[in-house]
């Protein structure tokens, strides 16, 4: 447990100790190594990690300790011993004994460690390299042969293991068991034969396996997508946000020569802590896919898409949209800025409220629910919850970081978890959730049967609840009667932001109703428009089934649109904003290439409603954001659209 977590507990007893001659006061239970960090004293370590339970495996953090004048007979691992009253600690900085012990441990760790630094992916950011320099001997006394293993072993399609590099810190095995709940990797054998491996009869199967690569301190675990690709000092790192779900993970994107080489979990104690899922870590190859669209496309007289100039494409799109009845499908991949641009483009440039971000299954009841029943839950509420209810929501599949937060509290406090679903999933099984088994369409009765909720309870609702008439109304009633906190969790990263931006048929930005005259005047004033359309617009399904002549499609995942819907859309004039070729571009008359999240700055809004900003990682990209192209298209139509570019 971190100092921050300890200090937030009520009536925490504070303990004062002395480290290297300096007094420090910390909450009771704080480990010596954390107390030293508070003073700015860095004790070398490999197995220690602030989010994992202490193991004392590597012994690199040995220090001299005495309590009330009585000294321990030998140096102790500072990562396993909590601070006590009257404790005096001497680290390697003030104790020759501790310094000698640390140098001895380092020498033992290096006996069988290979000299792979020249080719190891960890080189340049390796704790073993750094601490061998700062806390090791300047010369090696070892003259024997180092232990050799076959290298590397592919323990999954994404993770490789070099066993001879491993220092047996057990970070990876503790993460798999304590954080992910997937014991997919373990320590085999004992003593000098001990090594990391996977279970013989069980596959290396986890949504979170990439975190073991990031926390490995020595390069024993490496990712296949980054192996032998670059050195840390060759990379330009940019803080970013994950675009794959509504969890809102902080990320770090590493780019070399204008190309993303890897993505790492960023640190945000209030959201993803220091973890992310494998999709967020490795699903970035679409940026350089072979079917990436880099130039505008126009369908010619023979029905083939041909490359065109920007003026030609803008003119063709404007001609098809200007005098037509139009709908706008935004999709859940759009950033907040782009969704706001589509919302403004529909109302100002096209004079219509026919706009919807829900390419998936949806309903009018869902819109009423989202407008009247806002999300009140946060990650902190999950951390304090006594009961978490999952309604048509599988957190491990749909929002992996929410699952980790629930699992953390399940391990810590054995909180109660209930799930309204048709079967027990792998994730709910790990949470030992109570299954309220429900056939499709029976959710209303199941929701009405839930009792015993309180203000400390959290109800998490997935987007699939919109498929059952009355389900979301039952959820609203449950929340009002119990006082429980509510979280609406869509699958896509952009859906919460699209709702806030007014990319729906009956709401303006800020969840203000279309039929509210005052709201229309306020928004029109901000947008510099004389007036806004007053008629409630069409939903996605209504747009597809209508007699509208044209549809603007952007940020939509093609997999969300059914084959029947694509057939109906093919009969309309389609203007597509797309990253790469898809089923939508195959039926479009005009296609505009748009920038990916690494090529533009912007923000997403996570399920809590928290804005997650990110900067462009590839600054020299020639690709334009959706909102910039919308501004150009609005100018071509004849309605000026000024949005943040």
Can you describe what each PLM-predicted range is?
Residues 1-31:
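Generic start-of-chain signal for non-secretory N-termini
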Residues 2-8, 59-243, 247-251, 256-263:
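Fe-S ferredoxin-like electron-transfer domains
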Residues 11-20, 87-89, 293-301:
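Short, contiguous pre-domain boundary segments
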Residues 30-34, 335, 539, 625:
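Short, structural beta-strand-to-alpha-helix junction motif
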Residues 32-66:
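A basic, amphipathic helix-loop patch mediating RNA/tRNA/ribosome contacts
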Residues 110, 114, 162-164, 169, ...:
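Catalytic alpha/large subunits of respiratory electron-transfer oxidoreductases
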Residues 598-618:
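Glycine/threonine-rich phosphate-binding loop and adjacent beta-strand/alpha-helix elements that clamp
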Residues 620-645:
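Extracellular/periplasmic ligand-binding modules, especially the Venus flytrap/periplasmic-binding
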């Amino acid at each position: 447990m971190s100092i921050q977590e300890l200090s937030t507990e009520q009536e925490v007893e504070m303990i004062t100790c002395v480290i290297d001659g300096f007094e420090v006061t910390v909450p009771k239970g704080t480990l010596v190594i954390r107390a030293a960090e508070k003073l700015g004293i860095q004790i070398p370590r490999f197995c220690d990690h602030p989010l994992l339970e202490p193991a004392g495996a590597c012994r690199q953090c040995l220090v001299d300790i005495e309590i009330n004048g009585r000294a321990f007979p030998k140096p102790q691992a500072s990562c396993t011993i909590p601070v006590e009253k009257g404790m005096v600690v001497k680290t390697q900085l003030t104790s020759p004994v501790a310094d000698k012990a640390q140098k001895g441990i380092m020498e033992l760790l290096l006996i069988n460690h290979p000299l792979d630094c020249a080719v190891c992916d960890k080189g340049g950011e390796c704790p073993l390299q750094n601490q061998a320099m700062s806390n090791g001997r300047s010369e090696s006394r070892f003259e024997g042969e180092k232990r050799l293993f076959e290298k590397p072993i592919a323990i999954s399609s994404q993770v490789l293991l070099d066993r001879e590099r491993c220092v047996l810190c057990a970070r990876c095995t503790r993460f798999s068991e304590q954080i992910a709940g997937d014991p997919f990797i373990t320590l085999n054998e004992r003593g000098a034969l001990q090594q990391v491996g996977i279970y013989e009869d069980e596959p290396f199967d986890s949504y979170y396996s990439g975190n073991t690569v990031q926390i490995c301190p020595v390069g024993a675990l490496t990712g296949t997508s980054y192996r032998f690709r670059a050195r840390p000092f060759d990379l330009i790192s940019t803080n970013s946000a994950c675009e794959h779900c509504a969890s809102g993970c902080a990320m770090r994107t590493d780019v070399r020569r204008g190309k993303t080489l890897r993505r790492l979990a960023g640190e945000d104690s209030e959201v993803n802590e220091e973890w992310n899922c494998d999709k967020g870590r490795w699903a970035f190859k679409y940026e350089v896919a072979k079917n990436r669209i880099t130039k505008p496309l126009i369908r010619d007289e023979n029905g083939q898409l041909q490359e065109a100039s920007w003026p030609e494409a803008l003119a063709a799109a404007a001609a098809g949209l200007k005098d037509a009845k139009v709908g706008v499908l935004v999709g859940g991949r759009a950033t907040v800025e782009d969704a706001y641009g589509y919302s403004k483009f529909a109302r100002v440039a096209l004079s219509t409220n026919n706009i919807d971000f829900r390419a998936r299954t949806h309903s009018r009841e869902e819109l009423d629910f989202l407008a009247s029943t806002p999300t009140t839950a946060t990650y902190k509420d999950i951390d304090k919850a006594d009961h978490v209810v999952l309604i048509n929501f599988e957190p491990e599949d749909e929002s992996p970081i929410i699952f980790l937060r629930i699992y953390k509290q399940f391990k810590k406090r054995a909180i109660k978890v209930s799930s309204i679903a048709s079967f027990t999933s792998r994730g709910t099984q790990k949470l030992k959730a109570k299954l309220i088994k429900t056939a499709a369409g029976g959710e209303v009765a199941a929701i009405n049967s839930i009792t015993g909720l309180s203000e400390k309870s959290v109800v998490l609702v997935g987007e699939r609840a919109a498929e059952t008439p009355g389900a979301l109304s039952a959820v609203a009633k449950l929340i009002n009667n119990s006082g429980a906190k509510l979280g609406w969790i869509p699958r896509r990263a952009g859906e919460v932001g699209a709702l806030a931006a007014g990319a729906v048929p009956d709401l303006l930005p800020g969840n203000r109703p279309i039929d509210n005259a005052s709201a229309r005047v306020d928004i029109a004033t901000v947008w510099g428009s004389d007036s806004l359309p007053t008629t409630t617009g069409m939903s996605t399904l209504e747009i597809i089934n209508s007699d509208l002549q044209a549809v603007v499609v952007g940020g939509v995942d093609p997999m969300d649109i059914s084959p029947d819907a694509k057939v109906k859309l093919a009969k309309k004039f389609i203007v597509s904003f797309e990253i790469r070729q898809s089923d939508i571009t195959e039926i479009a008359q005009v296609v505009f290439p748009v920038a990916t999240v690494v090529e533009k700055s912007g923000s997403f809004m996570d399920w809590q409603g928290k804005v997650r900003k990110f900067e462009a990682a590839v600054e020299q990209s020639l690709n334009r954001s959706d909102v910039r192209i919308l501004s150009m298209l609005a100018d071509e139509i004849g309605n000026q659209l000024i949005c943040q570019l």
